[in-house]
Amino acid sequence: MLIRKWKAGLLAGLSILALASSADAGEVRMTVAEYSAKTGPYFEEVKKAFEAENPGITLNFEVVPWDVLLQKLTTDISAGTNADLSIIGTRWLIDFVQQGIAEPLDGYMNDEFKGRFIETFLSPSVLDGKTYGLPIAASARAMYYNKDLFEKAGIKNPPANWDELKADAAKIKALGGENYGFGLQGKEIETDVYYYYAMWSYGTEILNKDGTSGLSTPGALEAAKLYKSMIDDGLTQPGVTSYAREDVQNLFKQGKVGMMITAPFLSNQIKEEAPNLKYGVAAIPAGPTGARGTYGVTDSVIMFQNSKNKEEAWKVLDFLFQKDWRAKFTQNEGFLPVNKEEAKMDYYVNNADLAAFTALLPDARFAPVIPGWEEIADITSNAMQSIYLGKGEPDAVLKDAAAKADAILKK
């Protein structure tokens, strides 16, 4: 795991942070995660507008694909050539804080600035009472459904629970052809998360109250058996473990999947790539007791502690988190608003898709901000792949995964 290697390179001490980031005086550099083809052009607009308002500061962005972002940061930090600012997955933040890499931002923020944010999305970046990151991207997860397939299959409403989902998926399968009831992700980023949706609905959390893994609990087992039964009954697309999130989304956009769970950015993709597709957005199905959960996600901007231009870097952050620039970014990428004033804009208030996601926020869980989280997520993903492929009985696979996760949690 990259974070483990990354930690190992820094455990010798924090002398690396004494190395200056390579920005010149008056220059601010920011590493940016690429969310879509719109990301780069947006930040070019920001650069032009910011430099026009701040003639003494040069602003440069480096846009990096998500799948290599952590490796890029690892390399730059190890060499002392990191930028002044960077977007990171908030779930990585604790590692950056523990290694003294992220600068606390509270000393730069006044009440007006802090008051811009919706607390739900700012709080994951607060550790031990200090704010180390600002939420630049936020989303939750909900269930998309294909209205045309529902109509053909005689389904009137989206399923309220997993039993109804299985029944509806069977009706869609019965239509024949390349029609799949439920799109199930089985590889790459968020394979573990797709499992958590069912796990949460069966009353199980990722971590038990005593801090141990929840993977060996009865609810975790029932959730795994649920997904495996859908695979065995042919209610999902074939070859689940060869489908990443984007692959399942593509099947949905092609009109081949009746239901799938994903983020609000799919709505933007449908409007641009499949404008004739009739779809709806509904809550993730509930479990036997009515419990349900969605995945809340934030990405944060951090300031590096070794930045030579912190005051200038803060000006960039203040600029980026103004309402109009936030709204343009959020709407381009299909995220949820993190700015209170932005959330009041007509675009959000009158957007039925986003309203469906917002309604689920009271049930949102965020990835635990704990050391070793990425390794634990990998363990969970690998376990689910083994179960989906039939390489082991769910009970045994989950107990083994829980033991591996607990070993990390005890470190």
Swiss-Prot record:
A molecular function (GO) term: maltose binding
Main location: periplasm
InterPro entries: SBP, SBP_1_CS
Keyword line: Periplasm, Signal, Transport
Subcellular location field: Periplasm
Keyword Methyltransferase listed: no
Annotated SUPFAM superfamilies: Periplasmic binding protein-like II
A GO BP annotation: transmembrane transport
GO cellular component, one term: periplasmic space
Signal sequence residues: 1-25
Membership in a protein family: Belongs to the bacterial solute-binding protein 1 family.
Protein purpose: Probably part of an ABC transporter complex.
Subunit structure: The complex is composed of two ATP-binding proteins (BAB2_0493), two transmembrane proteins (BAB2_0490) and a solute-binding protein (BAB2_0491).
Protein name: Putative binding protein BAB2_0491
Organism: Brucella abortus (strain 2308)
